[in-house]
Amino acid sequence: MKSFRLTISLLFITIFAHAQAPATIATKNPFPTISTLSNWASYNSQEKFNIDVRSLGFKFEEKSVEAASTAYTYIRKVTVDNINYTDRIVYRIANDNSASIISLVTASTDLVSFFTPQLTGYKTGKCDNEMSKDKKTTCTCYDNGKFVIDVCDERVKLTMGDGNNYFISVAKK
């Protein structure tokens, strides 16, 4: 009977110790795929984009109206390796709803490594964006006939040391 009680006690201790163990950190990448970004660039509708981007944890930050287009900026705060980052995604749409561009900027995740394998079927071309003119920035530009995609890695000085900002832009042709 003593061994039975001991066995039951050990069983309960094991169950309760396991139940109180810290939850494992999710390894799912919270960034949209190239396919998703391309779909968003095809929407030509901020309302549809707004619903989709919020599902990834982004919150609306600001609206910027310009002569030919309107930009909607969304941000999300993330912590990676105990360092706080702000991810930013901008949805720019022509005022006549004829075209839209998605831009994503982050320092929290290496977007070049994340997106490059997804772009194997795209043709690489000459980059003609503002970031590609900066000596501290490396850009690779892709084209599949329907979309133009720029992926950039910018070397930056941070208070805690050197780092990188990553940028991707998807525009429908």
Regions found by a protein language model. Give the residues of each.
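Secondary-structure transition/turn motif
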Residues: 76-79, 103-109, 143-145, 163-173
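Core segments of cupin and vicinal oxygen chelate
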Residues: 49-75, 125, 137
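Short, exposed beta-strand-loop hairpins at the edges of beta-sheets
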Residues: 142-163
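Bacterial Sec-dependent N-terminal signal peptides
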Residues: 1-25
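Sec-dependent signal peptide cleavage junction
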Residues: 18-55, 167-173
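Exposed acidic/polar residues on beta-strands and adjacent loops within beta-sheet cores, strongest
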Residues: 62-69, 129-132, 161-173
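Long, charged/polar, surface-exposed segments that mediate recognition or autoinhibition
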Residues: 83-141
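Accessory recognition modules or surfaces
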Residues: 20-40, 62-93, 143-147
